[in-house]
Amino acid sequence: MVTGIEATYMDFTRRTARYPKRREKEYLMLGLMNEAGEVGGAFKKEIRDHVDNTDLIIDEMGDVLWYLTRLCDVYDIKISELMINNIDKLLSRMTPEEAKAYREEG
């Protein structure tokens, strides 16, 4: 069961979703890719224009989070499980010594 802010945000994304349900996965995946590109675009402008685009990057990352959260909901994946799975995957790519050092730091 999802609780706390994760449940609140997932419910928010359900109630604010406005797209054709019959092609939900396709719409969400394309939206996620588009928003990730907008994060990259904001960063590119930061470099090119020598300005701080942190606020724009935060806004675009929020859109990425919205799409990612909707995809987690559609695939019945808890965001916390996604995080744990990703940690495990990344630790498995480390040498045993690196993984041990990481665990001891954390």
Report residues per predicted region:
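Flexible "arm" and connector segments at domain edges
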Residues: 1-106
